[in-house]
Amino acid sequence: MQTIGFSLSQRENKLRAIRFDYPEYIPMTLYLNKSCWHHYDQNALQDLMESHPFLFPNFKRQKVVRPEYLLNQLKDAPYTDPWKCVWETMDDGITGSVHQHQLGDWSAFEKYEAPDANKTDGTYPIDWNIIRENVKKGKARGEFITGGLPHGHTFLRLQDIRGYEDLIFDMIDEEPRLFKLIEMVEEFNCQYVKNWMELKPDMMKYPEDLGMQVGPMISPELFRKYFTPVY
């Protein structure tokens, strides 16, 4: 697959960018948030996308745009993820946040179980047969194949399960059950990564949010103690 106006394939250009080997252009992916389609004029948005084919190479104009929302992007429809955390959002298309933490009380930990990495990425249900087939087709087309953990795979996952304040107190107090919970999340992530590695992707990614606008969400000392071993 080639980008119009360039000689390198998209895959080769990405590999060169990763290796700092003089790519023809900086690889990027630009999205319009799905909520935009019910907040702004759809024709104006489509005009914008149509005028930038480099940024939106697969754009096809539609009479009416009806986005497909993810399970935690639906207003007035709380979503319980595979870790039993309940997500809510105030606007269709905006990814929600966890409002009910499954282990807001440690008393439920004894019977708490991790989901199956063969059936979910931790946030949504998945079908590895479909993923496997899509990877196969992508490779046949010469595409750059990316695998990896979902966003918020460890620190944010623990925050969703326990709640931010309780998680921080657990780290300060050296709560023994926290170590067991971290191990549970780590084992799930490792199995998920192994499943992806079997498909031999070009790149693996591990996206996570660890900082705020002016600094980290936890001290470097706590990060080194609880998260460096996992990473």
Model-derived regions, located:
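Short, charged low-complexity intrinsically disordered segments located at boundaries
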Residues: 42-51, 77-82, 166-167, 224
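Histidine (H) residue identity feature
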Residues: 38-39, 52, 99-101, 153
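A contiguous, low-structure linker/loop signature
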Residues: 70-120, 140-144
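Segments that shape or occlude catalytic/ligand-binding pockets
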Residues: 33-72
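Hydrophobic transmembrane alpha-helix bundles
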Residues: 61-72, 94-110, 180-192, 228
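Active-site loop segments of alpha/beta catalytic cores
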Residues: 1-42, 113-231
